[in-house]
Amino acid sequence: MSKLSRKSILDEDEDVEEILPKTRGDERSTWVSSSSFVSSSLIFCKCVVTVVELDVGVALLGIVGRVVPLYTVTLLEPEFLNLGGELSWCSMTNFCELFFYFFSFFFSKKRPNIDSK
């Protein structure tokens, strides 16, 4: 009799094991597919953000490499600032020149000639 009861308990356990893995498998496959979609979209967003950061970083390096030396040269000119510390008209023209060089750097393939004065 103990063998019979043991067998019936084992049969019940097998039935439970047959039902549970299917349920767990379905839930798990849904979870895996949704998590893989989320992770792939996050990876895509991270790649886009990284590319944008690289573009902005390269652009900033280009600006710093081109504009800062020119700006320091114009700061060393004696007529750039008046004695009150306010910007003079000459400094505004130098400021406009900075923007001209900045835009010509991005819209032309060769470097603008800074020493043309």
Swiss-Prot record:
Transmembrane segments: 32-52, 56-76, 87-107
Superkingdom: Eukaryota
GO cellular component terms given for this protein: membrane
Keywords noted in UniProt: Membrane, Transmembrane, Transmembrane helix
Membrane topology recorded in Swiss-Prot or TrEMBL: Multi-pass membrane protein
Compartments where found: Membrane
Name the UniProt record assigns to this protein: Putative uncharacterized protein YOL037C
Native organism: Saccharomyces cerevisiae (strain ATCC 204508 / S288c)
Taxonomic lineage from the root: Eukaryota, Fungi, Dikarya, Ascomycota, Saccharomycotina
